[in-house]
A protein has these predicted regions:
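Alpha/beta enzyme core
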Residues: 1-98, 106-128, 136-139
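Short hydrophobic "strand-cap" motifs at the C-terminus of beta-strands
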Residues: 101
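C-terminal active-site subregion of NodB/CE4 polysaccharide deacetylases
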Residues: 132
């Protein structure tokens, strides 16, 4: 199955609370992608948003059928915070997965975000995380 990434480039519409516009735009992508067997991941760029925006975006993404919500591209300030990850999990329907990007560089951090309900992680330190996991398994 293919994955269609929708990077939220509708920042002005979100900040002005024009969620009808945002929903229509994301819905169009979801319908086109799902019609071709692809999944849809909506990237928020949380460092630019207030909690109320993140909450509403999670609701909208669930309503229009997005498969994932993602904290950021990983290039913005701050990375995936516990606060944002818990908020996104709490505000998204159970069928919408949460992906953390930025700030997951150790096996312990991976376990911590997993405990918050994250099902996917974007990490540049994947090799180091896996090496740490293997070392622990060897005991």
């Amino acid at each position: 199955m293919c994955l269609c990434r929708v990077q939220l480039r509708l920042l002005g519409k979100v900040l002005s609370r024009d969620y009808g516009y945002v929903a229509a735009d994301v819905r169009a992508v979801v319908e086109a992608a799902h019609g071709r067997g692809a999944l849809v991941k909506v990237i928020f760029e949380n460092c630019f948003l207030q909690d109320e925006h993140k909450e509403e975006l999670c609701r909208v993404c669930g309503e229009v059928g997005a498969d994932f919500v993602k904290t950021s591209t990983g290039y913005g300030d701050g990375g995936a915070t516990d606060h944002d990850l818990a908020l996104m999990r709490r505000c998204s329907p159970p069928y919408v997965q949460v992906k953390a990007a930025g700030g997951v560089r150790t096996f312990d951090r991976l376990l911590a975000v997993r405990a918050l309900g994250v099902s996917r992680v974007g990490a540049t330190a994947s090799k180091a995380i896996l090496d740490e996991c293997r070392a622990r398994l060897k005991g």
